[in-house]
Regions:
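Metal-dependent phosphohydrolase cores
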Residues: 1-145
Length: 145
């Protein structure tokens, strides 16, 4: 679980500050993602660990942190809501598109950030990530479930 305790955390927080302070992004706190973890906390964890990996590999850690923070911005309870009951079977396939659509309404995104959000469910979906940064978030997301 992400906890703030050093300079690397300060840099990470500055990269995603405009995202985490947004009221719509904050709404992810209302939805459970995995077990007792909120969607917000899950995205924050994926963003932090992906950021660390990308930074160590000399990749675009800013795009990684930002894309990962928004990768599950679908804003519904996929287990219990009426909408989710109809879509539960398809949630894994459709939520990346919903998250990208929601993100684009709020923020300017780079091509890498868009790819990270849209393709993070590979290999469940057939949308193959285009960038190494997208693979980092994809695998960190799987590890964080």
């Amino acid at each position: 679980m992400y906890t703030r305790n050093n300079n690397i955390c300060e840099e990470f927080e500055n990269i995603i500050k405009d995202l985490t302070s947004n009221p719509t992004v904050q709404k992810m706190n209302q939805f459970k993602q995995h077990y007792n973890t909120s969607c917000y906390d899950h995205c924050l964890n994926v963003a932090f660990y992906s950021y660390i990996i990308a930074k160590k590999l000399g990749l675009n850690y800013k795009a990684v942190a930002r894309g990962a923070m928004l990768h599950d911005l679908f804003l519904y309870d996929w287990r219990n809501s009426k909408k989710a009951l109809k879509l539960r079977k398809f949630h894994a396939f459709i939520h990346p598109e919903i998250a990208l659509e929601n993100s684009l309404k709020l923020f300017y995104l780079t091509e890498k950030e868009k790819d990270i959000i849209l393709k993070h469910m590979w290999p469940v979906t057939i949308k193959l990530p285009k960038y190494p940064e997208s693979y980092i978030v994809t695998f960190t997301d799987k590890y964080s479930t």
